[in-house]
Amino acid sequence: MTAATMELPHTYMVFVLGGKVFSFEARLLWEASTSVGFTEVPKFGGHLVGVTQMHGKIVPVLDMAGLLGMTKVPPPGGFIAVSLPGTNELLTGFTVDTVVGYAKIPPEDIQRCEDDTAVTPIPYLKGWVEEGKKFPLLDMERLVREQASGNTEASDVNQGEENV
């Protein structure tokens, strides 16, 4: 167990995108906001929508809906920035519809995916949270690493939001 995991045991960041609830491990959260201004990067391609400056760092901003194969619903009402443990260079921001907040979710309420390479209806799926209503737990660490390396094949799995 890492120090970050010990500081935030069983804690997850919850957000809404396209009317659906998603979550990821809170230990990866660097910042969450209801709005962050960013400079758009037109015609850049891919899922990069812009860049922003936060706490003296330039942060790329990606379209989370596009990464998950969903239809983009502008304008975003929320922003989350993720930083991978032990790396300063893998700081990435994402547009989301709404930042809900933190949730304590006991391990018994999480159904992990058996195999990370299994074909799933949602790119970057790590598991399912079964707390009242079932919603996806995303593998943000894998998502950020793949986007940073240019390996975006997992984000092309879906072509429509009906799968989410």
Where are the regions that the model predicts?
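An acidic, low-aromatic, low-complexity terminal/linker signal
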Residues: 1-164
